[in-house]
Amino acid sequence: MPENLGPTAEFPIRNEANQPFSWPAAQPDQGAVLLVHGFTASPWEMRPLGRILQQAGYAVAAVRLPGHGTSHEDLRRRHYEEWLQAVIEGYELLQTGHRQVFGLGISTGALLLAALAAQQQPAGLILLSPFLRLRHWLAPACGLLQYVQAYQERTLRPELIPYYYRYRPVAGVHQINRLLRRVRRELPQITAPALVVNALGDRTVNVASGRHLFERLGSRPKAYHLYGPEVGHGLASPDQPCWPDLISLVLTFLRHHDATETGRSPSVP
């Protein structure tokens, strides 16, 4: 990873669990899955999914988006192009050792994978909690608000404080808005098979815009799944009541498109 994308002496990684990770397949290799975490999170967020995918026969690698896993001050100075570059480099690294690479991302991580897929041709995309609009009505104005208020404070459960930021940089939300403008333009160009998942209980993003994203996707085939109000934004968490069903959806999608690529019959999760 280039020096400008990595941690620095000023902003070191504050917890080893926030480091990027790469795990080989526990069974004969069925391909690889690139995992991309969300805004103000860290690779730790993707570990539960990563372990399940590894045990199912997939090599997995999770990137750390620049400015994440260090400090909110570090994130404040970052641009979405740096995040996207980290995703591109992770994808290209997996490509060198695997016959096919899937992408699985949550929230902003899902948007970054969509931007990647407009340039590359992954074997498939799994987009968890994607969106074209954030829920907060002031989110579109963050380009100006960043000069008035630097951070938005939120409440975190104590056990999550090492892995997520309590303070969200408003400048970072502005970067998400910039990324959204790009993704909106590029969605029709994406052709990789896609699974898109949202939940009615999501209080972070505009859920209807997730469906709109799905409809604009040029992917063929593509599938959309909407969970109910009991399920929230953090679909990568085993604490979600939909977790067993979500794992089944993900594995079925991967195995089907893995079989499509190789000519083998898809196995049942």
Q: Where are the predicted features?
A:
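Catalytic histidine-centered segment of alpha/beta-hydrolase-like enzymes
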Residues: 230-244
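Gly/Ala-rich beta-loop-alpha elbow adjacent to hydrolase catalytic centers
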Residues: 105-113
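Catalytic nucleophile-loop/oxyanion-hole region of alpha/beta-hydrolase
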Residues: 71-97, 102, 144
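Short alpha-helix in the alpha/beta-hydrolase fold that links the catalytic acid
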Residues: 49, 192, 206-215
